[in-house]
């Protein structure tokens, strides 16, 4: 049994099964989620003899393999999991919030052509406790409370929906992060957007679009061959109608590839009458791809074209770029010496 991810009631039942009074469950809950205990030996309110007897009980915490601090304050961690697999997670601070970009899988099966994670292949899904651990570890390393969580790290969250939903429940119930402060990002998986809508969450759905037509999207996102853009947009419209929540569309801008005037016109036509917002993300370079990052001037020009066509859009500035901690740059292994 892994303790991280258990509710206060479940922890109470567990300590009572160990022959301890029920209030120890609330103490355990506080030490796991508020104080970030990495082992039961740290929980000094427990009797020493009982702590010794629990030496083999797994809390579910990872080991930090390295930490890199970017010039803008962003922190990237490589975490080693219990089975030796590794993932990266990123803490993004600002004056009034701390956002954690969490991974949902070890690697990613989507193999997007401009993303470092997909270049390394896919290993497995993360368990709920491995997602929660990323939040608690960033919180401890950065010395402040996490306020926002975005499922935009390694992996495709909708291919690991049960663990992601369980993690969202725990983030809200046990760590105190409101659902409206949680974002789930997806490239689009058939039937999964509909399944997510059925849960009626107050989270934000971010759809990685990256192209305004089917042919170009298939070049950039191989899985798009199995999920026509027309169906994806139809599912997104149904999601908005069912949940009342606005969708964010992520659009990585690749110089000379998807940023021409005709692309702006196609995107405006695609999203006409849609309750949505488009985030333009300038491409963050990786060694395995030959794409180019657009100039700031060209990016602003593309934004202006979209806005003139009636698209609600903005430019999302990348954080942690100098430490390969930006969108599309996360990996399973350390590249920076």
UniProtKB/Swiss-Prot annotation:
Q: Where in the cell is it found?
A: Cytoplasm
One Gene Ontology BP term is: rRNA base methylation
Q: Where is the active site?
A: 88 (proton acceptor), 327 (s-methylcysteine intermediate)
Q: Which Gene3D superfamilies does this UniProt record tie to the protein?
A: 1.10.150.530, Aldolase class I
Cofactors demanded by this protein: [4Fe-4S] cluster
Give the top-level enzyme category: transferase
Q: Which cysteines are joined by disulfide bonds?
A: 101-327
Q: Which UniProt keywords apply?
A: 4Fe-4S, Cytoplasm, Disulfide bond, Iron, Iron-sulfur, Metal-binding, Methyltransferase, rRNA processing, S-adenosyl-L-methionine, Transferase, tRNA processing
The enzyme's E.C. designation: 2.1.1.192
Similarity comment: Belongs to the radical SAM superfamily. RlmN family.
- What is this protein's name? Probable dual-specificity RNA methyltransferase RlmN
